[in-house]
Amino acid sequence: MSDINKKNAILAIVSALPEELNFLEEYLQDRDGWKKTKENTYVNAKQRLEIVSKVFGVGKVSAAYGTADLINENDPDLIINVGYAGGLIKEAAKGDVAIGTDYVQVDFAPYFKNNLPQTAPSPGVLVDALEKEASKLNITGYKGRIATGDFFLHSTDQKNKILEEYSPIAFDMESAAVAQVATAKNVPFIALRTFSDLADDTAAEQALANKHDRETGQRIPIEHQPIKLAVNTAERYVDLIKRTLS
């Protein structure tokens, strides 16, 4: 385990890709009270809050392995998974944010339902706090189930099938795997995912456009939304993070 100060509330912010987490350091530098430590964590002594971050790679296996490693090293009080997702609800628009309440793997289908992985829902009090903070930040947020699978969802037909069977608000490739490991380790978990596309027949085109913007040095503000929401909520409701394990 690292030398993280357990007198602080420990928030772990994780992502699949570096670009989904790059904004964290820039954002904390512009906020009062934050200092970077020699362990590359971020501490706010007044708030008694510490943030650790980790990029674990794309897909469920990378997410599960990275989450287990993170928990063993840092013993966080709460894990927030930020990054992109495909929006599944009809009112969704690019840049809106999904606030996860519960998580399901759509490509895991054992014959007996009691063999399904055990995944705890996100703490309701923190989901509500994130929803309130989203409103204050003028971020359009939706709370609900997030579906996960080891594939890029870019088919309207497949999207509709997932909606019919699981009723999620968003689809990604990691959240349910992180949730499964966090549940096994008794660590509360929430996913905050910004809609990069609508997970339909136009999704591949949108992904290529985002990639081009990034490679040509253009900022993509929608990547910043989950980090702003996570940090602001943690600062405002730091006591809730400590209470999630009580």
Spans of model-derived segments:
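Short, conserved "active-site rim" segments that organize catalytic pockets and cofactor/ligand binding
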Residues: 8-32, 50
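Basic/polar N-terminal segments that are highly enriched at the extreme N-terminus
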Residues: 1-6
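Glycine-rich phosphate- or other oxyanion-binding loops that anchor nucleotides, phosphorylated ligands
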Residues: 8-11, 35-246
